[in-house]
Amino acid sequence: GIVSIRINSPLLENIELADALVKKYDLQAAEVCLSHATDEYQLARQIGAASGEVIRRCIHDSMSIGLGWGITLKEFVDQFVGFPCKDVSVVSLLGSLTRRSSVTRFEATTELAARLDAECLYLPAPIVCDSADTRRLLIEQPLFKDIYSRALQTDLAIVSIGGLDSATIRLVDLVTDEEFDSVRAKGAIGNFLGYYIDEQAGIVDHPINDRII
């Protein structure tokens, strides 16, 4: 007869899921981590820990790194084992000016740069401007243009996608309840680099997205 052996391992399932993601979305690679998280913070911590070694393999001398913002990326940096690099810069991919400590505690650009002995650059603007006109004025400033140009040319972008309710921008009250309900009604399903996105990953046509940097 024929003996068939199958190992029912969660790790094997993760590999199969990763392969399926690569094929479906034409990716170069994907990693799926086992999680028993009971809340968003536990999930962020587990994803942060799992992504550390993957990202570490992508970092080398003479490169620029763009870094997003939020709970998951802060957990990634907090658990990341750094190493000295030469001619490396880390650029924030979102605005960095704020008066709220609740926002600052999720900023990780400074720490990642320190762990790599790298230059650190910030976008000199808030994440959410008070109006679209203010945003237009800020992005026309020479200093902003210079750093924004460098952010667009990074060799490696480290970012995360937040759920609609769990996105850090929502948790720290950078949008009002009224704005949140309104953008949800417009079809938003998540948040990427501050922008609310729909199920096709398009930026939702909503005034809040006109104020994001």
Question: Which stretches of residues belong to each language-model region?
Answer:
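N-terminal active-site beta-alpha-beta segment that forms phosphate/nucleotide-binding
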Residues: 6-132
